[in-house]
Swiss-Prot record:
Record-level GO BP terms: protein urmylation; tRNA thio-modification; tRNA wobble uridine modification
Function, in words: Acts as a sulfur carrier required for 2-thiolation of mcm(5)S(2)U at tRNA wobble positions of cytosolic tRNA(Lys), tRNA(Glu) and tRNA(Gln). Serves as sulfur donor in tRNA 2-thiolation reaction by being thiocarboxylated (-COSH) at its C-terminus by the MOCS3 homolog UBA4. The sulfur is then transferred to tRNA to form 2-thiolation of mcm(5)S(2)U. Prior mcm(5) tRNA modification by the elongator complex is required for 2-thiolation. Also acts as a ubiquitin-like protein (UBL) that is covalently conjugated via an isopeptide bond to lysine residues of target proteins such as AHP1.
Record's keyword terms, sorted: Cytoplasm, Isopeptide bond, tRNA processing, Ubl conjugation pathway
Gene: urm1
Subcellular localization, as worded in the UniProt entry: Cytoplasm
Organism (species): Sclerotinia sclerotiorum (strain ATCC 18683 / 1980 / Ss-1)
Superkingdom of the source species: Eukaryota
Name of the protein in its database record: Ubiquitin-related modifier 1
């Protein structure tokens, strides 16, 4: 059985890149469907990023109660994810997902 995949770009700014090995851009090849056979969503991607990509143990700086932490702006192809259905947005080939921390220490 072959698994269909999607190529997407994920970017982190505003300090979030430090949670991802100080790498701002991540070109990812991910499965088109989750373990249940449903199309993968941004919500699935957030979990995938925490489980597979993030090397830092401070996952609570990125997620809170299984959701993207308040204070992190998420853009899907340069549009606010609130306009795209937030975590339920179904990922498409060549999507660009940008996570921006709007909270800065001082």
């Amino acid at each position: 059985m072959t698994t269909e995949t999607l190529n997407i770009m994920v970017e982190f700014t505003g300090g979030l890149e430090m949670l991802f090995s100080d790498q701002r851009n991540h070109k990812l090849t991910i499965p088109q469907t989750d373990s249940k056979g449903d199309p993968v969503t941004v919500g699935w991607l957030v979990n995938y990023l925490c489980e597979e990509i993030m090397q830092d143990s401070r996952k609570d700086m990125f997620i809170l109660d299984d959701h993207v932490r308040p204070g992190i702006l998420v853009l899907i192809n340069d549009a606010d994810w609130e306009l795209e259905g937030e975590a339920s947005y179904v990922l498409q080939p060549n999507d660009n997902i940008l996570f921006v921390s709007t909270l800065h220490g001082g």
